Curated annotation (Swiss-Prot):
Protein species of origin: Bos taurus
Start and end residues of each stretch annotated as Disordered: 239-261
Protein name: Armadillo repeat-containing protein 1
SUPFAM superfamilies xrefs: ARM repeat (SSF48371), HMA, heavy metal-associated domain (SSF55008)
Chain intervals with Basic and acidic residues compositional bias: 246-255
Keyword Plastid included in the entry's annotation: no
Length: 282
């Protein structure tokens, strides 16, 4: 068995590898290739059992991205250890609440990929209720907030926004729609949207307004109060979970890895697969 310390100077460690896979999976153009690769999907499954919680969370984020592609779901569901590993993450008492919710969502997506009868639907609902029980009362439901962010106009600003949102305890996921300067954020029901605005305002270069729909269905921008809101911060800075496919056209590629190209992604997949085989197969 190779220790991570012996290879750290030569190869990236587990967290950097899984984070790179997560970033590659964020680009819709890479998702099929990652799932078809012989080493990446099994590696992500093994990462779900990693002792380092950020590695587990990042692996789940990558899987959630991959599951957004409907063509991937059957293969993912049938991959050896996938569903069992997701169950283990959900049921493990030491798993953080947001991580359990993320694993539960992936499980439900894959479990429902070929469901056609009522029994299967009931099984999925039962599964969701069980996951909610594990999450506790403060995590029963999540809500989605759509933000229009003035100043969100390049990758450096997006990175600033990511860092600000990742610090907020209760943020489950977010995805960017750069073409329209928007961010779709999924948060726990007990977190106020004003906390998101305060975090974004703390960057000093961006300001958020909430996007809401009127009774007639028209979108409106609602400004937040300028009064800062006290924000409970994460101590371990978990990663985020992507939302469902954006209603805007996919070519926006708002969540693409910076500088990613199909050929570059394929090259990096080879590097990642090589690392996974060296690290996990013995």
């Amino acid at each position: 068995m190779n220790s991570s310390s012996s290879t750290m100077n030569e190869e990236p460690d587990a967290l950097s590898v899984v984070n790179q896979l997560r970033d590659l999976a964020a680009d819709p153009l890479n998702r099929r290739a990652i799932v078809q690769d012989q080493g990446c999907l099994p590696g992500l499954i093994l990462f779900m059992d990693h002792p380092n919680p950020p590695v587990v969370h990042s692996a789940l984020l990558a899987l959630r991205y991959l599951a957004e592609c409907r063509a991937n779901r059957e293969k993912m569901k049938g991959e050896l250890g996938m569903m069992l590993s997701l169950q283990n993450v959900i049921q493990k008492s030491t798993t953080p609440g947001e991580t359990k919710l993320l694993a539960s969502e992936i499980y439900d997506i894959l479990q429902s990929s070929n469901m056609a009868d009522g029994d299967s639907f009931n099984e999925m609902n039962s599964r969701r209720r069980k996951a909610q029980f594990f999450l506790g009362t403060t995590n029963k439901r999540a809500k989605t907030v759509v933000l229009h962010i003035d100043g969100l106009d390049d990758t450096s600003r997006r990175n600033l926004c990511e860092e600000a949102l990742l610090k907020i305890k209760g943020v489950i996921s977010f995805t960017f729609q750069m073409a329209v300067q928007r961010c779709v954020v999924r948060i726990r029901s007990d977190l106020k949207a004003e906390a998101l605005a305060s975090a974004i305002a703390s960057t000093k270069v961006m300001k958020a307004q909430q996007v809401v729909k009127s009774e007639s269905g028209e979108e409106m921008l609602v400004p937040f109060q300028d009064t800062p809101v006290e924000v409970e911060q994460n101590t371990e800075l978990p990663d985020y979970l992507p939302e469902d496919e954006s209603p805007t056209k996919e070519q926006d590629k708002a969540v693409s890895r910076v500088g990613s190209h199909p050929e570059g992604g394929a090259s990096w997949l080879s590097t990642a697969a090589n690392f996974l085989s060296r690290s996990f197969y013995w």
